[in-house]
Structure formats: C-alpha cells, structure tokens
C-alpha cells in the first residue's frame, strides 16, 4: 500500500511537470519565427499530444490506485485501450517529425506558403494512422493462440468469483516493442541522408555563387540547422524513452499491480523530455522559452514593467526633443546622450556644437544669438517645459522662441 502511494504521488508530480513544460513551450512558440510555419505547427501539435498523454497518466494512476481496474477482462480491455490510444501519437514523435521534414523538403507549396488546410490534413493523417496502427497491433496480440487460451482460462476463474490478476496487455504485448523500436532505424537513416544532401548542395551553391537560388539555399540551410539544433536531441530523448519502457516491461519482475504503476510512471518521461530536447541546442528558442516560463500574465509582466517604463520614457524624451527641433522652437540638442543628458545640455545653453555660455545676473543666458528673440522664463517655461529625469528644478528646459516678426499666425506653427 505504501509503495502504491509513492508511485501514485510520483506519477502525479511528473505528469504536472510535463504538462507545465509543454504549456510553456506552446506559449514560447506562439507566433514564433524560430521554426518555419509548417514545422512549428507540427511540433506544437505533438506538444499538445504529450499534454494529453500526461493527463491520461494521472487518470490511469488514480484509477489503478482507487479501484482494481485490472481484475476483470472487460475493465482491463478498456483500461489498456485508452492508454494505448493516448500514447499512439507521442510514441511516434520521431517518425512524424521525419515525415514532416520530407514533406517540407519536397513540397514548395508547403515550404513557401503553407495554408491551414495543409496543416489540418497532416494532423488528421497523424491521428488516424497512429491510432489505427495501435489498434491493429493490439488486435494481433489479443487474437494470438496464447492469448485466446489465457482469456478462456480467465473467464472460467472469473465465473467462479475468485479474485484474479490480469497482466496488462500494454506490458505483455511484445509487438509494441518491435513496432515502436523498428521505426527508429529508418528515421535516423533518412535524416542523415537528407542532412548530407542538404549540406553538399548548400556547399556547391555557395562555391558557385548561386545567390540566384537564394530561396533554395535558405531551405537547405534550414534543414541543416533543424537537424543540428532540434532533431538530434529529440531523437535521443525518444530513444531513451523507448529503452526505459523496454527495461520496465521486460527486465523487471514484480507483482502485476506494482509493475503497472511503474509502467505508468515510465509514461511520464516523454512529456518532460520532449520540450526540453527542442530547446537544448536552440539558443533563440531557449531564450523565448525561459522568457515565457511564467505562464501567469501578471506575474510574467511584473518583472518587465520597470524596464518597459524606462524604454518608453527615453523614447518619449527623444521624440519630444526631435519634434521641438523640427518646428524650430528648440535649438539643436545632442540626443545621443539620452533624454536626461539632452535636457541638461539644453538647460545650460549647450545646443549643438555651440560653446557653453555662463549665466549673467543670476539668470539663464539665451541660446539664440538673435537679440530679437524672446526668452520665456515665466509662464511659458511652466507651460512648455518637460521634466527630464528626476531632477526637480534642475530638470527645467529653457525654450527659446523665434522673433515675433517671424511667428506665423494662430493655428499654424510652421
């Protein structure tokens, strides 16, 4: 009983971690340009499939802990079928990623302008093919001679009201191991051949100065980048998940109930490593991922609020100074020194390349050399000054207007 509680708690924690990591990945890749559109949509769809897998693990662990779902043939059939379907797509992550790479490489339409119907059709194919293959393999195993004899014996025991223990067909079915394991070999062979072909074509195009085929060169470069940054780590993660399942199902001899709980915990591994494998070698995606690691919008934006305010304040200061210079109200100010520096220069009469002019009689000297210009030190200073920085009175800017004779009529500032 204690061991079951430990396994259930660990399954719950691992499943929650897997769901959260995949939600962070979905948030980070929303409208992201790290991957091409078709590739990004496929990876996001696979991430959703891993979320479904993690949620099914929680439900399965709760059902196994709260009720003896593997004590009758009917309950075991429903239990195994549900778990098999929920893992149908995640178990083929490498396969569908390889198929997407082939489709992306061979189809200019998908590569250049992938419409939603292409993405939808590809997703439907993924779901239908994965589920059908899982059901076919399960049917082949259950209809074998050994399983038919075992099922007949279990029906006799069940009719006598004796408590029986049925080993889950998910664990006993060896065809699943051959089916999932044999797909890794062609996937890696096809990927290596595509990588070598893309690398050779890209090298020849660059040596021949083939910038006329710029779109093709970018496509080949994208193939190589995806293989190095994402595919290799994803392949290693999925292969490790497959090896973990084989070890749990074939090399550990425990009671059926304990082995079932260990198998459910092993299913929690893939939803965790899937998003981590995609961001491991991809620097740009890793930055976006950790930038969106806090899913709560308020909490995520809280640490950005002060930085955004500083940027907005600096841009506002530079915009105000540029507008005043453009309409001739303010003399030239070096805005490259930032808002506060420009404000201090304007206050001290150091506009443009002019030399500083000391104040006379305790009053600020005018920047303009025109004797007819008007220096507003009263109400105009109160109405037209901008506080640059946090300097209080030292943040005042002296605006020097044009002579009265050159001031245009009302309604137009010129």
Curated annotation (Swiss-Prot):
Membrane-protein topology: Multi-pass membrane protein
Keyword Translocase among record annotations: no
Gene Ontology cellular-component annotations: membrane
Transmembrane segments: 1-21, 45-65, 124-144, 175-195, 232-252, 259-279, 336-356
Region (Disordered): 351-414
Keywords recorded for this protein, A-Z: Membrane, Transmembrane, Transmembrane helix
Localisation per UniProt entry: Membrane
Keyword set includes Protease: no
Polar residues composition-biased segments: 369-383, 404-414
Protein's name according to its UniProt entry: Uncharacterized protein ZK1320.5
Species the sequence originates in: Caenorhabditis elegans
Lineage of origin: Eukaryota, Metazoa, Ecdysozoa, Nematoda, Chromadorea
